[in-house]
Amino acid sequence: MNAIMGMTDIASAHIDTPEKVQDCLRKISLSSQHLLGLINDVLDMSKIESGKMTLAEEVIELPEVMDTIVSIMQSSVKARQQQFDVRLRHIRHEQLCCDSLRLRQVLINVLSNASKFTPPGGTVSFDIEETASENAAKAWFKFTVRDTGIGIKPEFLRDIFKPFTREKDSRIDKTEGSGLGMAISKKIVDLMGGTIEVSSEVGTGTEFTIRLPLPISELELGNFKFPDLKIIVVDDDVIVCEHTTELLRQIGIRSDWETCGQRAVQKVLAAHQAGEPYDAVILDCRMPDQDGVETAAIIRRAISEPLPIILISAYDSADVETKARHAGVNGFMTKPVFMSTLCRALQRYVLGQAAADEQKLSLIHISAP
């Protein structure tokens, strides 16, 4: 409800900016759907207990599902001034078959709890990893949610997946909730043939791990290749750097990475002076030593030749778009960066082509190396 009210206020303040209003309306719609899902928790529990809950099997685009989840979570973590880290590992399949509504329900519930019980300034991290599978028709995914919150007492941890269970603690008495969310999540994960585990330490934080076998869609196509390019990836998170450079490698693009904006500038300038320039720079927006916008501005001042610079942000890029454009940034990507997201950005900002191949790019399957 806070997200709906907040986006409504923002839309009203930008009534003369159609793109901003449209974006707000999209987020209001997503949040409204989530609110309706929460209202239906009691009905879901009733269905589960009577054995009447069934799962739909539909073709889903994993990037779209994750984008919805991240969009919903952004309002919560921003309001609480928390850091929200989303990272991908070894994702080989993006088009899958499952009940997207129930998948979102489980992940949003766990993420919402993580944010709810983490103090301002804390961190919520969300890792999505595709792990090894012995069944060629299914992909195993591991979703890990960690927080630096208040933690869960051992006596409550034992009953966390039981219906109407809420910890009696002065630290959380003012926190709203039905006490059904985790019980429903556990039942849905069971129905999907997966597992959900939790570990916690009071005063340190909590970690949920969800493992799910998701059927691979037969609609996925073969590999997509780009011409010979060299790109540098800059992000203070080593995992993000390794993931993005691995995606680039899989589509035949040479790449380097740096975790520091200042060192990245030095590397870009050195390559340019040596006559072996980079074809593009992919920059994280938020870095501790020198943020992406500042790094882009320094590169632009030093190199006069065209050099595409793409900014990645864990949040809505509209917050920094004007400043970034003035600094010389060409385009934007939102974390987490999937293969299809990366290919579209390279197609548009590096190759300068219209998104004529978006249909093809949305159906990418990358073979395991």
Identify the meaning behind each predicted range:
Residues 176, 181, 185:
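Short alpha-helical Gxxx[C/S/T] motif in the catalytic ATP-binding
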